[in-house]
């Protein structure tokens, strides 16, 4: 298992939910974290934590964040894409704006982030990429097709990172949670909150993946709060 001391993790979506839980866990473990969020004022920077403006839907934002991270920390060892949106977009919606927004933020945002950080991940020889996908990226169980399509795309992106980065020591994992008790599932009424997975559960799994050596790579982690016989 790799020692976190001296390793720098770029983490989007750190202000809330899974991203916030992961940030706190990584800092406690001894990682340095570069947090990217749309409103940097929501977090207070300190020695091990730098806070940067980042909008996953804005072209050029990833490059600015990478530059700020290198200026502050001097290296990038891992990228965790935890930012995402989940408006409703069904197959029958004539207005495709929600589809476009999710494709831009959920699928293209992580791609732009990885591309911007790529040279630094290569340079460290043990680069790590973790993309927060969803069980909706493995099967379709409701009418929010737009969200599922964007998360299926994250699975494809993760596979390409594994293919393109393998010889450089880059390892990538797609983490696919079911319902997690965060504000993104506030609309879910048919599942009691206490039965859902906790953000801290997902954070623990991600930290474990980040610690794995190059000789033990996990392609996908499917995590659910209940038994599901379709997976």
State where each predicted segment sits.
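Conserved glycine-rich cofactor-binding loop
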Residues: 15-16
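Conserved NAD(P)H cofactor-binding loop of Rossmann-fold oxidoreductase domains
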Residues: 82-87
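Substrate-binding pocket helix/loop in short-chain dehydrogenase/reductase
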Residues: 90-91, 98-100
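Active-site helix of classical SDR
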Residues: 114, 150
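Residue(s) in the substrate-gating loop at a strand-loop-helix junction
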Residues: 134
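Active-site-adjacent segment of SDR/Rossmann-fold oxidoreductases
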Residues: 139, 160-170
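C-terminal helical subdomain
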Residues: 167-170, 174-175, 191-231
């Amino acid at each position: 298992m790799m020692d976190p001391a001296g390793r720098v993790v770029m983490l989007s979506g750190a202000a809330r939910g899974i991203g916030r839980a992961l940030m706190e866990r990584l800092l406690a473990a001894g990682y340095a974290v570069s947090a990217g969020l749309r409103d940097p004022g929501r977090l207070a920077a300190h020695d091990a934590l730098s806070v940067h403006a980042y909008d996953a839907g804005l072209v050029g934002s990833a490059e600015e964040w990478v530059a700020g991270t290198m200026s502050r920390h001097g290296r990038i060892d891992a990228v965790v894409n935890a930012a995402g949106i989940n408006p409703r977009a069904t197959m029958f919606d004539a207005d495709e704006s929600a589809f476009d927004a999710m494709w831009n933020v959920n699928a293209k945002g992580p791609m732009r982030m990885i591309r911007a950080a790529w040279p630094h991940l290569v340079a460290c020889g043990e680069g790590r990429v973790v993309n927060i996908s969803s069980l909706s990226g493995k099967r379709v169980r409701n009418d929010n097709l737009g969200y599922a399509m964007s998360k299926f795309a994250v699975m494809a992106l993760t596979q390409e990172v594994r293919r393109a980065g393998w010889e450089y020591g880059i390892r990538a994992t797609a983490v696919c949670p079911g319902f997690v008790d965060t504000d993104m599932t506030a609309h879910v009424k048919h599942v009691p909150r206490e039965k859902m997975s906790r953000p801290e559960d997902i954070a623990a799994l991600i930290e474990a993946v980040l610690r794995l050596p190059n000789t033990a790579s996990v392609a996908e982690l499917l995590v659910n709060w209940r038994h599901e016989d379709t997976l």
